[in-house]
Amino acid sequence: MKRSLTALTVTAVVAAAALTLTGCSGSTPTEDAAGATAGTDPVALTMWGTYGNGGNTAQTDVLNDTLIPSFEASHPGITVEYVDIPYDSLKQKLTTGAAAGELPDLARVDIGWVPQFASLGVLASLDETMDDFTTLADATYPGSLATNAWDGHYYGLPLDTNTRVLVTSQAALDAAGMSASPATFDELETMAANLEGTGIALFADSGLQGWNVLPWIWSGGGEITDEGLTTSSGYLDSAASVAAVQMLVDLYQADAIPNLITGNSGATSTSDGLPSTQYATILDGPWMRDIWTGQYPDFTPIYAPVPAGDGGSVSVVGGEDIVIPASSSNQDAAAEFVRFTQSDEFQLAMAQVGQMPVVESAGSAAAQADPFYEPFATQLATAKPRLAIPQSSEVDTILSTELTPAFDGSTTVQVALTRAAEQIDALLASS
């Protein structure tokens, strides 16, 4: 599967240019990289990323002022220039750069992009080029690692991660007569019954894409495909998957879930509805702490695992991966920086500015240093990735398009998931 960019067929280059903006321990140096550290062959690496997205300078400051200087000090002869690019522009820049043969040595990319670029031969397969890849990979959260897999190889390593957990408030728990967050599907339904007549909706979410519905399907014991990513039929439309989605549909039709989930842009957002106690629960991530601290300083959210069904408590993985373009002429030096990103030094420094570690031991250490991260680190132990295929954004469209009529009552959940599975089968076949 590994190909250099110069070996790409004309078709693949055209396909790369056609990609759209779809798509959220240190180690012993290699012999070649060690030569660079000795100063015999200076190497200047360039890395593209989005650490400054939204005007956030805290992460770029740590990277440029602390981490890169530390790496350069321990690797004489290798320098790293980080180029910050707006998130909305990075994928297009990578796409046009691939077509023109003008890519950096390293890139921090959204987890959903790795299969797309790997399928076009744009990325180096790290499991083939890094002798210690297995050791590094085994130290990360399995769900985060899986986002780098494509066609039997791994084209990156996790860089930072996140997941969604259940968030509620003491006011909502009091209104429902509960002493703790609902830990199971049954307790969630009990909470819904207890909230009847209070004017508080049980749960809210902003869509029906994979990010939204997969935690419920997985926790209910369902799957979206088989393990080998060859078929969706029989999995997405299984009895377990149907039952999990049916629970949401029943709650929606009982007015326990507002129509924000089916696309009503005029509905109160989850970030406003939870602190104002319009909504009793939502699923959300660690980034909400800073948002609520600024907008609702008196609000104290309560974080807990996704309610468990027959499949346990399972959420969805988000985050970014680090990749090496196959066109880079500095593969060994770039691999040295990839190794550095997996170290406790890098992971814990970034944790202090809001990036959740991908290395399990660093995740535990970050949770001990800041208990806020504990529920997210716990959830990541079982969290799963969305489908790691080039057409992942199309899967989201299929789910949303087919599930909306089921929520509105114009079709059944079984029919909706069967239709979705058939369309995903076609995507898997074309992959």
Q: Where are the language model's segments positioned?
A:
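Glycine-centered hinge/linker elements that transmit conformational signals in sensory
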Residues: 192-194, 231-261
